From Swiss-Prot:
Membrane topology summary: Multi-pass membrane protein
Binding site for Mg(2+): 385, 442
Subcellular location: Cell inner membrane
Function: Member of the two-component regulatory system PhoP/PhoQ involved in virulence, adaptation to low Mg(2+) environments and the control of acid resistance genes. In low periplasmic Mg(2+), PhoQ functions as a membrane-associated protein kinase that undergoes autophosphorylation and subsequently transfers the phosphate to PhoP, resulting in the expression of PhoP-activated genes (PAG) and repression of PhoP-repressed genes (PRG).
Site location (Plays a critical role in the switching between kinase and phosphatase states): 202
Binding site for a divalent metal cation: 151-152
Positions in the Cytoplasmic compartment: 1-16, 216-486
Primary gene name: phoQ
GO MF term list: ATP binding; metal ion binding; phosphoprotein phosphatase activity; phosphorelay sensor kinase activity
Taxonomic source organism: Escherichia coli O6:H1 (strain CFT073 / ATCC 700928 / UPEC)
UniProt xrefs under SUPFAM superfamilies: ATPase domain of HSP90 chaperone/DNA topoisomerase II/histidine kinase, Homodimeric domain of signal transducing histidine kinase
Residues annotated as domain Histidine kinase: 274-480
Name of the protein this chain belongs to: Sensor protein PhoQ
Membrane is among the record's keywords: yes
Length: 486
């Protein structure tokens, strides 16, 4: 049973639309039809009453009161409006005259009806109605068909009661006119049957049209579902914004979400790449220290602080990049104050261990008063990448100098290597771009350095060094000190 229910529930939008609209159409059709039929029925009753009242007036005109007796003379040429039977009563309810002797019909007339004008109905079985219409062969044939279908069927006859006050020539009379043709056999009664047929035909025609309308109306949703499937299959990057007005906001928000998720994914991937690159230096120092321990060039007591320092740096770098990955655009930068000289001393010390075999000579010309305003890890990451690049490509010498203004910090790194061709001085800051493809590397370090300096409204300018190699000028902006709390 549950499986069967799952096949139908939850219902699709098309089925919901079809069922809801069909229900509305059915209810409205029934409501309008019932109003029309009730109105027609009321109008039919009024018309019938007027016809029977006219018949009653005719008999009142033909009636004569002579010798305390009622006489009604019917001319042979009178054309009655419909087959009827007339009964005339006095004010006490006593039958004075009957057009025909039909005992069962006389018993059906209620005494209360004779007190006032009114329109009533009486129920009779098919056989009694047949006796009442014994002279009408066409009606008899119809009654026979009804009898064959249902021998216990009842026929409804309309009854009009009209009370006439006493006059100088006539006492008070009550004339009852009975329509001998039952309502069920009148052509007007067929309206009820027609209504059923019309309603059925209406539904049979409307449901296919509603299905077409639902298909056409829900095409934008089907198109959206198709685009979502294409997104899942990686055949599409964004949803088509050219859709219906009702779906525009949804599509726009979904596209924003997709773009945000894609940017977050790219950011995580970039951060992971940057983290991998940043761990190269401390891992290289650890590797160099382990070699020194193995060759007994360094004692355990000397190697321990070096290794602990690099492990601490690895931990800091992991925390730093995790923090960067979780930061959103526009996050305020740290406003901490850090002396530049000690930070560069630690970096050069680590790089000397990495490039120990190469014998790189790194010289510093940094005033103790020069400070960096910002996050320490940002500074270490930028200068670590720039200095690593200088040590990698230099022949022997690397020189570092710095100066500071109210708003900017300038750090210049020069080497005596082959330098950077003029045509490559902008390309090297793009991810994956390298001047020398023969040396190991991924082309990530300078790109990371530039991205961080841009967060400080700064930049890195590549040029030619007086030593004959490359000259990298790192410029940090936003270096005004934060106001101190008093």
């Amino acid at each position: 049973m549950k499986k069967l229910l799952h096949l139908f529930f939850p219902l699709s939008l098309r089925v919901r639309f079809l069922l809801a609209t069909a229900a509305v159409v059915l209810v409205l059709s029934l409501a309008y039809g019932m109003v029309a039929l009730i109105g027609y029925s009321v109008s039919f009753d009024k018309t019938t009453f007027r016809l029977l009242r006219g018949e009653s007036n005719l008999f009142y005109t033909l009636a004569k009161w002579e010798n305390n007796k009622l006489h009604v003379e019917l001319p042979e040429n009178i054309d009655k409006q419909s087959p009827t039977m007339t009964l005339i009563y006095d004010e006490n309810g006593q039958l004075l005259w009957a057009q025909r002797d039909v005992p069962w019909l006389m018993k059906m007339i209620q005494p209360d009806w004779l007190k006032s004008n009114g329109f009533h109905e009486i129920e009779a079985d098919v056989n009694d109605t047949s006796l009442l219409l014994s002279g009408d062969h066409s009606i008899q044939q119809q009654l026979q068909e009804v009898r064959e279908d249902d021998d216990d069927a009842e026929m409804t006859h309309s009854v009009a009661v009209n009370v006439y006050p006493a006059t100088s020539r006539m006492p008070k009379l009550t004339i009852v006119v009975v329509d001998t043709i039952p309502v069920e056999l009148k052509s007007s009664y067929m309206v009820w049957s027609w209504f059923i047929y019309v309603l059925s035909a209406n539904l049979l025609l409307v449901i296919p049209l509603l299905w077409v309308a639902a298909w056409w109306s829900l095409r934008p949703i089907e198109a959206l579902a198709k685009e979502v499937r294409e997104l899942e299959e990686h055949n599409r990057e964004l949803l088509n914004p050219a859709t219906t007005r009702e779906l525009t906001s949804l599509v726009r928000n979904l596209n924003r979400l997709l773009k945000s998720e894609r940017e977050r994914y790219d950011k995580y991937r970039t951060t992971l790449t940057d983290l991998t690159h940043s761990l190269k230096t401390p891992l290289a120092v650890l590797q160099s220290t382990l070699r020194s321990l193995r060759s007994e060039k360094m004692s355990v007591s000397d190697a321990e602080p070096v290794m602990l320092e690099q492990i601490s740096r690895i931990s800091q770098q992991i925390g730093y990049y995790l923090h960067r990955a979780s930061m959103r655009g526009g996050t305020l930068l740290s406003r901490e104050l850090h002396p530049v000289a000690p930070l560069l001393d630690n970096l050069t010390s680590a790089l000397n261990k990495v490039y120990q075999r190469k014998g790189v000579n790194i010289s510093l010309d940094i005033s103790p008063e020069i400070s960096f305003v910002g996050e320490q890890n940002d500074f270490v990451e930028v200068m670590g990448n720039v200095l690593d690049n200088a040590c990698k490509y230099c022949l022997e010498f690397v020189e570092i100098s710095a100066r500071q203004t109210d708003e900017h910090l300038y750090i210049v790194v020069e080497d005596d290597g082959p330098g950077i061709p003029l045509s490559k001085r902008e390309v090297i800051f793009d991810r994956g771009q390298r001047v020398d493809t023969l040396r190991p590397g991924q082309g990530v370090g300078l790109a990371v350095a530039r991205e961080i300096t841009e967060q400080y409204e700064g930049k890195i300018v590549a040029g030619e060094s007086m030593l004959g190699g490359a000259r990298m000028e790192v410029i940090f902006g936003r270096q005004h000190s934060a106001p101190k709390d008093e």
